[in-house]
Design a protein with these regions (language model features):
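C-terminal accessory/regulatory regions appended to core domains
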Residues: 1-205
Length: 205
């Protein structure tokens, strides 16, 4: 792959990463609030219907935990790859810290300074969690020059984008997410009935 083509593909993947990361964060937020409503509403409906939990009825093998989506899985890297990623992440974090340092923000408005401070906090959190892809997004937002792309960078970005995309799609297929999109109580109760059947809730005898 030519250097020009590699650079353009890298830029494309970074843009996709920024969108997917924002979309993933949005889905996590929506899922988190919807899960609480789902659990409370289902428990109320279950009691009204006189259903026992699988554990109470001892009608299934084992106990089925509450439905949860699988979080983004960390890419399995060999030691050399990990070291290279950590080196790039460290460089990016230092550049972000420099760009968001209070001494560099004196010419900005109070609102802009607050935004930069929040970006630094997010970058520090991402750095401690080894979430290099979030550092990449923050660096892009700050117009910080990114590392010269390599084929390895392309592969890592493609893998991370795929993981984010798969996680988002999985969340959208969960009962919690579908419940949150239901237009009325009747459709929600139909969903509860299906959920109860799949998980193994049974009527009181």
């Amino acid at each position: 792959m030519s250097a020009v083509r590699l650079k353009k593909k890298y830029e494309k993947l970074v843009l996709e990463l920024r969108y997917l990361t924002a979309d993933y964060d949005y889905h996590r937020l929506v899922y988190g609030t919807a899960q609480k409503r789902f659990e409370e509403s289902f428990e109320h409906w279950r009691i009204e219907q006189g259903l026992l939990t699988p554990a109470e009825a001892r009608a299934v093998q084992g106990v089925v935990p509450k439905e949860e989506f699988t979080d983004v899985v960390t890419i399995e890297e060999d030691e050399n790859t990990k070291k290279r990623i950590e080196k790039v992440a460290t460089i990016l974090f230092k550049k972000i810290a420099k760009a968001t340092h209070p001494d560099k923000l004196l010419h900005l408005s109070e609102e802009e300074r607050a935004t930069r401070l929040q970006m630094f906090i997010e970058a520090r959190k991402a750095s401690s969690r080894r979430e290099w892809y979030r550092l990449l997004c923050i660096a892009t937002d700050l117009a910080i020059s990114l590392p010269i792309p390599t084929k390895e960078h392309i592969t890592l970005l493609e893998s991370k984008n795929s993981e984010l995309r798969d996680t988002i799609q999985y969340m959208e297929k969960t009962y919690v997410w579908v419940y949150d999109q239901m237009p009325n109580e009747e459709s929600k109760h139909r969903l509860f009935k299906e959920f109860a059947s799949v998980i193994g809730y049974v009527p009181v005898k």
